[in-house]
Amino acid sequence: MLKTESSGERTTLRSASPHRNAYRTEFQALKSTFDKPKSDGEQKTKEGEGSQQSRGRKYGSNVNRIKNLFMQMGMEPNENAAVIAKTRGKGGHSSPQRRMKPKEFLEKTDGSVVKLESSVSERISRFDTMYDGPSYSKFTETRKMFERSVHESGQNNRYSPKKEKAGGSEPQDEWGGSKSNRGSTDSLDSLSSRTEAVSPTVSQLSAVFENTDSPSAIISEKAENNEYSVTGHYPLNLPSVTVTNLDTFGHLKDSNSWPPSNKRGVDTEDAHKSNATPVPEVASKSTSLASIPGEEIQQSKEPEDSTSNQQTPDSIDKDGPEEPCAESKAMPKSEIPSPQSQLLEDAEANLVGREAAKQQRKELAGGDFTSPDASASSCGKEVPEDSNNFDGSHVYMHSDYNVYRVRSRYNSDWGETGTEQDEEEDSDENSYYQPDMEYSEIVGLPEEEEIPANRKIKFSSAPIKVFNTYSNEDYDRRNDEVDPVAASAEYELEKRVEKLELFPVELEKDEDGLGISIIGMGVGADAGLEKLGIFVKTVTEGGAAQRDGRIQVNDQIVEVDGISLVGVTQNFAATVLRNTKGNVRFVIGREKPGQVSEVAQLISQTLEQERRQRELLEQHYAQYDADDDETGEYATDEEEDEVGPVLPGSDMAIEVFELPENEDMFSPSELDTSKLSHKFKELQIKHAVTEAEIQKLKTKLQAAENEKVRWELEKTQLQQNIEENKERMLKLESYWIEAQTLCHTVNEHLKETQSQYQALEKKYNKAKKLIKDFQQKELDFIKRQEAERKKIEDLEKAHLVEVQGLQVRIRDLEAEVFRLLKQNGTQVNNNNNIFERRTSLGEVSKGDTMENLDGKQTSCQDGLSQDLNEAVPETERLDSKALKTRAQLSVKNRRQRPSRTRLYDSVSSTDGEDSLERKNFTFNDDFSPSSTSSADLSGLGAEPKTPGLSQSLALSSDESLDMIDDEILDDGQSPKHSQCQNRAVQEWSVQQVSHWLMSLNLEQYVSEFSAQNITGEQLLQLDGNKLKALGMTASQDRAVVKKKLKEMKMSLEKARKAQEKMEKQREKLRRKEQEQMQRKSKKTEKMTSTTAEGAGEQ
C-alpha cells in the first residue's frame, strides 16, 4: 500500500482535487511493479492499463514506458530489452472492424499502410544506452524519449495536421503518436449541437466518421471499462455464480491448458466474438459490494459504460498498432513480416519461458485469481505469453473514487509497506476467494402486520448478512523508507509548481472568449503521469488576455476559478475553461528569471511544427486559403471554442481531415484505389462544406447590402431631426436665459425681504421679552409692598402691646419700691435697691425678655424679705459673667473715660460695671449692708475710677427716683431704635439722632450733637468738615458715619423712586377705574336712553 504524507508535510499548493485518488491507483500499479519486477509486477501493469480512471482517463502505453523507465534505473542492460519487449507486447482490446497490421506498419489517416521509419528493435536498443543508477533523472530520460518520438509523429495511426500542430510536443500516447493526435471526431461530436443549426454539412461529415469508427470504439471501450480492480480495505461481496465463473479459470494457471494460438480466432470476426462475449457476463456478475447495495452498483456502472461508449474513437485507435490481439490477427494479411518483429517475438518468448518456470514453483502455494474479461482480452498471443498474463493478475473495481480490496485466504502483495503475513499469503495463488464464508447472519426485519395499500416498495424480512471488515490499523502506515514512486506523479507536479512565480489574474470573458489557447505538456499525457501541466500556447490578437497583458505564452495555468489544473488531462482543462463565465480568476505560474524553461522550448517546437503543417495545408488546399486562419482551434487544445460567431463549418471541416507532414508518404506506389476513393470522398465533403459556407456568406452579403441602404435612409432622416432639434434647442436656450435672469432678480428681492423680516422679528421678540420682564417685576413689587405693609402693621401692634405692658410693670415696680422704702427706711438699703433696679432695668434695656425681668423682680422681693445671709445668692446672680461679656462686646474694646456731664451713661459705662463689680466683692466678703456706713460708701465712691458713681450715691432718694423714671423712659425707647430708623430720616428728632449714634457705638459724640440740635435733616447734610467741627476727630468714626449717611441717602433715594413709581401706578389704576366707571356710566346711559325711547314709542 502506498505511503502517504502527513498533512503537516503538505504545502499550501497541494490541491484538493479528486485526481489524487487516480494518482493513488496509478502509484499502486507502479509499486507492484517494483515489488515483483519479474512476473507479478508486469502482470499488474497489464491490469493497471485497463482500469477505469477518473474523468475519462485510461492507462495507455505511456504508463508502461514510465514504469519501464523506473525499472531501468536498477536493471542490467540485457534485462532492459526483455522488459521493454514484454511491455511493448501488451495493449488494450482490439477493434474488430479495423484492418490489423504488424508492428512495422502503421495506418495513416487516409487508411494507407506505411512502413515505420524506425523499428521496434531499434527502439529497444535505444533503451540499452540509458544510464544506470538511481541518481540519473528519470525526467531527463522521458524528455529524451519525447524528443525522439517527435520525429516519429508521421507514423501515427490516425491524426490531423491541425491537431498535430496544436499538440505536437505533447506526451506521446504510443511509441509513434501523441495524445493530442486523437480526438478529431471527438471535437466534432462535442460541437455537433452547435453546428447542426449553422452548417448541416458538418453534422453529416461527423456522422460519416462515426459510422466508420464507432462500432469498434464501443466494443473496445466496453471491454476495457468492464475490467476493474479491487484495491481498497473493504470486503467485496461476489455472488456464488461469479465465484464459479472465476473458478473455471483455475485451469488457465497451467500453461499446458491453453489452446494453441491458431484456434483462438485468427480473423476479425472471431476476435470480435471472443472479445464481445464475456463482457456483459462480467459486467452483470462481478460488481456487487458489501458496503453498497446492488442497485447502486448497477447505477454507477451504467454511467461508466455510457461514458465509455461516448469516448472518442481516436482514443482507442491509439492503442491499435501495439495491441497484441491486433498484431496476431494482422500477421496473415501482412505478407512482409520484418526481422525486427521476429526479434521482438523471440525476446518475448525467452522472457516468458523464464517466468513460466517461476510460476510453476509458485503454484504450489496458490495464486491470484483472474477475471474472465482478462482472459478474453488476451486473444491472439502466444501460449506462454497468455499464461504469463494470468500469472499475477488482480480483479479491479472502481466506483466514484472508492477503492476496495478483496480479502480472502490470501492477500496481494502491496509492496514494502505491507506486513510479512501479507507477503506470505501472496504466494498462495491456488487458493480461491470464497466471500460467502466470511459473513454472519443476524435477524432481519420483522413482518409487518398492516401493510399500507399505497406502498410501492416491499421490505425483505430475510436474515441480514454482516461481513467482516478490517480497520486501517491492520496496515502499517509508517514512512520509514521512501521508495522511488513517492517522488513521482502529483508530488513532482506540485513541486514544480512551487518553483514557479505564482500571481493571480482576473479576465472578463467577452463574446470572443478569453483569447488564449492551451496545450498540455508531459510524457504520460493520457494517464496524467509525469505531466508538466496546462500551458498557454498562443495569445489571440485583440483578445481579452492580450488587452490585459499579464498572461503570456508559455505561462502555466495553475487554477481557474478555484479549480486546480495541476495534473489533469487537457480535455478536462478545456472543459473547465469552456464552462467559465463572466469574470474568470486565474492563478498563473511563470518561470523565474534566469531559469531554463523546457516548456518554452517544447511550445516553440510545437509552433514550428504547426507552421510546417500550415504550409503543407496551403499547398494541398490552395483553393481554401481564405478560410485557413487561426480562429478554429480544437476544444482539447485551446479555449477559443467559446467564440460565438466562429463559422465551424469551414474551419472545423478543414481541421478534421488533415494530411500527413511528409510528401513522400503520398507516393503513388503506396496508394491504391480504395485510398484514393476515400481521399476523393473527403475532398468532396470539404467542397460541399465550402460551397454551403460560400452560399451562406452570399446571403449574408445581400442582407448586409439591404441593411446598408436602410441605414442610409435612416441616416438622412436622423440628420433632419438633428437640425430641427438644434433650432428648438436654441429657442429653448434663449427662454431659459430669460427665465434665469428673472429668477435672479426675484431671488435678490426675496433675500432683502427675508433680512428685513428677520430684523423685525428680533426686535419684536426683544420687546416682547422686556414687556414680560416688566410685568413680572411689577407683580413682584406689588406683592413685596403688600407684605412689607402687613409686616409694619404687625410690628406696630406688637410694639404698642409691649409699651403698654411695660408701663403697667413700671407702675407695679414703683408701688413695690415705695412699699420697700417704708419697710426698711434706711438710706443704704435704698441705695442698694436703686442699684439693683438700675442693673435690672439696664438688662431690660439691652434686650432681656419679660420672663427674665419678672425673675429679677421676684428675686429682689425675696431678697428683701429674707435674711441677710440669703441675699448673697441674689448678688451672685446679678453679677453674672454674661452681663460682663455683653458689656465688653458692646464697647468693642474702645473704652473711653466718660465726662462728668454725662450722667446718663454712668450706669451703662464700663466704670459702672467696675463699681458694680466692687459692690459684688463687698457682698462676697460678707459685709452686711446694715453695717456699712454712708461715709464708707462715700469713700468708696471717692475713688478716681468711679466719679459718676460717687455723684449718683450722693443724690437724694427723690432725685434717684426721678432718675430711675428717666432711665426707664429712655430705655423703653431703645427697643424702638430700629423702628425709628425705618421712619424717614428727615423726620428724626435730636433724641433719635442720639440713639442712632449710640447704635454706632459713638456715645461720646451724643452730647455735641444734642448741644448743636442736630436733627435728621441736618444729619443728612453733614460732611467731613462739619463732623470735625462737632468734635469727631477720629477718622475712623468719620468714615463710619459717612458710610452710614451714604447708605441712608441711597435708601432714601430708592424709597423716593419707589414712592414715585407707586404713585404712578396708583394714578394709572385710578385712571383705569375712572375709565371703567365712565364706560359703565355710558353703558347705563345708553340703556336708559334706549328704554326711554322704547317707552316713548309705546
UniProtKB/Swiss-Prot annotation:
Q: What does this protein do?
A: Binds to actin filaments (F-actin) and shows cross-linking activity. Binds along the sides of the F-actin. May be involved in neurite formation. Inhibits protein phosphatase 1-alpha activity.
Q: List all Acidic residues biased stretches.
A: 627-643
Q: Which ranges form a coiled coil?
A: 597-627, 670-824, 1033-1090
Q: Where is the composition biased (Basic and acidic residues)?
A: 1-12, 33-49, 264-273, 355-365, 839-849, 1051-1078
**Extent of Basic residues compositional bias:** 87-101
Q: Subunit structure of this entry?
A: Possibly exists as a homodimer, homotrimer or a homotetramer. Interacts with F-actin, protein phosphatase 1 (PP1), neurabin-2 and p70-S6K.
Which organism does this sequence originate in? Answer: Homo sapiens (Human)
Q: Which GO terms describe its molecular function?
A: actin filament binding
Q: What is known of its domains?
A: Interacts with p70-S6K via its PDZ domain.
This one is known as Neurabin-1
